[in-house]
């Protein structure tokens, strides 16, 4: 309530600032699913300001994926080499930053489109021109703190969340492989090399496997960094509880309550990955792509959409769908446009696809029916598709 009272004078400006910040963060870091740790906190503020869940979701997951679509520094594990790569390097472009201007164009236009879309929805709701079937169950998001904590301070929460965000950004951006910046690697080597009379301080007290900032995606494992993110969140949670003198029992109860809320999300994640396993092992998408014989923007885009829907995880999407599509390309002049196309398709499917992990989390956690979300978001998705097609066409013509 204290935080809400401070941002309430901003009104809709807070929504617009949230959209811009999430989009910029995703664009500059390439993070998408990793940012869900901040969604409940920000969305709760939006709900307490009096806006509905659709505004909260589109201002968070919508802006994150808009940022990904216009992501300037997006990288992922290449299943062929097990190293980090950009979309440009993946398709074969020698300059990994060749699409900086087109992506910035996508980013700015996408943010403007989302702000317009959300603002129009808010206006229509206020004027009672639209109505969506949404359960009024904000108690699922904001629970009364157990115990006598009336004098609890908000500044530790803000400071610690800011610290988590900074570490997350520094840890996830591949400084060495993407920018050839070795400062964090050398700092890590210096810290791990510290010793007292032959006793290695850092490796023996903390860990021998904790990687340097910017190298959290190590060993070609696309999920390895989630271990460090989980440990970081656990540490932050315990620190906040300690500073605010929250009782151990209350901390455990709140943690258990949070796990209980996430159980449906975990179940749906399991279902989504079951679809992935069946699709990936069957290999029918690769067969369809191979039978296409040649690259075609229309057909290849449809196959990319299908691959993103069925394979769920970006690592397997790249392995089973994007790689075969790129192998069909014989004209090197279209590499840059294809990189933008594939990145954009993955981002769009993540906003609207029923198997999108970030969407599954959001809709389940906030109890929003998928049909309601689809009814609300389809116009924005159509606008994004047209915007992506326009930018890709411009790159092809240039």
Question: Which residue ranges define each predicted feature?
Answer:
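Core transmembrane alpha-helical segments of multi-pass membrane transporters/permeases
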Residues: 1, 213-283, 305, 309
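Membrane-interfacial loop-to-helix junctions in multi-pass transporters
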Residues: 6-17, 49-55, 153-155, 226-227, ...
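Hydrophobic alpha-helical transmembrane segments of multi-pass integral membrane proteins
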Residues: 11-41, 266-282, 292-332, 347
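Hydrophobic alpha-helical transmembrane segments in multi-pass membrane proteins
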Residues: 14, 111, 160, 164, ...
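Alpha-helical transmembrane segments and, especially, the helix-loop junctions at the ends
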Residues: 22-39, 53-98, 307-320, 339-366, ...
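Transmembrane helix-loop junctions in multi-pass membrane proteins
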Residues: 25-34, 78, 170-181, 242-252, ...
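Long, contiguous bundles of hydrophobic transmembrane helices that form the permeation core
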Residues: 85-86, 94-222, 226-250, 365-372, ...
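Interfacial loop-to-transmembrane junctions
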Residues: 259-262, 363-383
